């Protein structure tokens, strides 16, 4: 049976010990290292090149959600299983959209964690069975479609508009001309079929086009 190297990222000793004990009967899941904050993840990934990363979202030093896209880009073959206390479905959606392969609640049984590991190990997606999988996948697909409406640059401009930047401020921030900023603004309004900035922002929030 193929051996899978696992890097465990969690700052709670009881969680670390619990996972290690749960995997003792399954030697093909080998925990090669565990670290306790987000800042240590990169060095550990470079050193051990894990097949699976078990990641908590609440970490000292850096938010687990923030590092998922970077890890996914740097190590695309590494599967990321988020192991968290957050039960909100919107967090599941954001986590999977960021590039995680699985989402498991810490309140779930060891059998659920094992099932999740077995699933993500073969490059499939796993969602904790206590969550509404169909609703999450529907929202995830809708988010993907919505994001494709706007270009990356348009989303950057949109975020700065939401933060209160003027056209001049956006042009300086993104190193583009004011004319280009105005063009992006008009294109976004046309795509979302709105006529005012307030309508643009309200529509963008409803469609989850603005990241926080």
From Swiss-Prot:
**Modified residues annotated as 4-aspartylphosphate in this record:** 56
Locations listed in the record: Cytoplasm
Q: Null phenotype? A: Decreases expression of genes encoding virulence proteins. Down-regulated targets are involved in transport, secretion, and trafficking of cellular components in addition to protein and membrane modification. Increases expression of invasion protein invF following invasion of macrophages. Regulation of gene expression is abnormal in conditions of acidic pH, during phosphate starvation and in low magnesium. Decreases survival in macrophages. Decreases level of biofilm formation and abolishes expression of csgD; simultaneous knockout of hns suppresses the effect.
Q: Where is this region: Required for prevention of DNA binding in absence of phosphorylation and for full stimulation of activity by acidic pH?
A: 1-138
Q: Where is the Response regulatory domain?
A: 5-121
Q: Where is the signal peptide?
A: none
The known PTMs are summarized as: SsrB phosphorylated on Asp-56 activates the expression of virulence genes whereas the unphosphorylated form controls biofilm formation. Independently of SsrA, can be phosphorylated by small inorganic phosphate donors (such as acetyl phosphate or phosphoramidate). Disulfide bond formation at Cys-203 is not required for dimerization.
Instruction: Describe what happens upon changing residue 203 to E.
Output: Decreases activity
The record's GO molecular-function terms, alphabetically, read: DNA-binding transcription activator activity; DNA-binding transcription repressor activity; phosphorelay response regulator activity; sequence-specific DNA binding; sequence-specific DNA binding, bending; transcription cis-regulatory region binding
Q: What induces it?
A: Induced about 3-fold in acidic pH compared to in neutral pH.
Q: Does the keyword Cell membrane apply?
A: no
The annotated consequence of residue 28 to A reads: Does not affect its activation by acidic pH
What keywords does the record list, in alphabetical order? Activator, Cytoplasm, Disulfide bond, DNA-binding, Phosphoprotein, S-nitrosylation, Transcription, Transcription regulation, Two-component regulatory system, Virulence
Q: InterPro entries recorded for this chain? A: CheY-like_superfamily, Sig_transdc_resp-reg_C-effctor, Sig_transdc_resp-reg_receiver, Tscrpt_reg_LuxR_C, WalR-like
What effect on the protein does mutating residue 46 to A have, as reported in its record?
Answer: Increases activity
Known CDD domains for this protein?
LuxR_C_like (cd06170), REC_NarL-like (cd17535)
Q: Name the major location.
A: cytoplasm
Q: Which GO terms describe its cellular component?
A: cytoplasm
Effect of substituting residue 34 to A: Does not affect its activation by acidic pH
What does the entry give for GO biological process? negative regulation of bacterial-type flagellum-dependent cell motility; positive regulation of DNA-templated transcription; positive regulation of single-species biofilm formation; symbiont-mediated suppression of host innate immune response
The record's note on quaternary structure and interaction partners says: Homodimer; disulfide-linked; dimerizes upon DNA-binding.
Write out the function statement from the record.
Member of the two-component regulatory system SsrA/SsrB (SpiR/SsrB) that is required for intracellular proliferation and systemic dissemination within the host.
Query: What more does the entry say?
Result: C-terminal tagging with photoactivatable mCherry abolishes the increase in activity seen at acidic pH, N-terminal tagging leads to slightly higher activity at acidic pH.
Its recorded name reads: Response regulator SsrB
């Amino acid at each position: 049976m193929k051996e899978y190297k696992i890097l465990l990222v969690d700052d709670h000793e009881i969680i670390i010990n619990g996972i290690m004990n749960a995997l003792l009967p399954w030697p093909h899941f080998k925990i090669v290292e565990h670290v306790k904050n987000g800042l240590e993840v990169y060095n550990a990934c470079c050193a051990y090149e894990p097949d699976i990363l078990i990641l908590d979202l609440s970490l000292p030093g850096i938010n687990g959600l923030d590092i998922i896209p970077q890890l996914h880009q740097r190590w695309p073959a590494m599967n990321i299983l988020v192991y968290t206390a957050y039960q909100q479905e919107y967090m599941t959606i954001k986590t999977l959209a960021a590039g995680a392969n699985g989402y498991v609640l810490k309140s779930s049984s060891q059998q659920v964690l094992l099932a999740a590991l077995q699933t993500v190990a073969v490059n499939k997606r796993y969602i904790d069975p206590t969550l509404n999988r169909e609703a999450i996948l529907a929202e995830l697909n809708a988010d993907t479609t919505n994001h494709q409406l706007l270009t990356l640059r348009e989303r950057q401009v949109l975020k700065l508009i939401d933060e209160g930047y003027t056209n001049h401020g956006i042009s300086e921030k993104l190193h583009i001309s004011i004319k280009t900023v105005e063009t992006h603004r008009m294109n976004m309004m046309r795509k979302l079929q709105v006529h005012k900035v307030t309508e643009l922002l309200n529509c963008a929030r409803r469609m989850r086009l603005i990241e926080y």
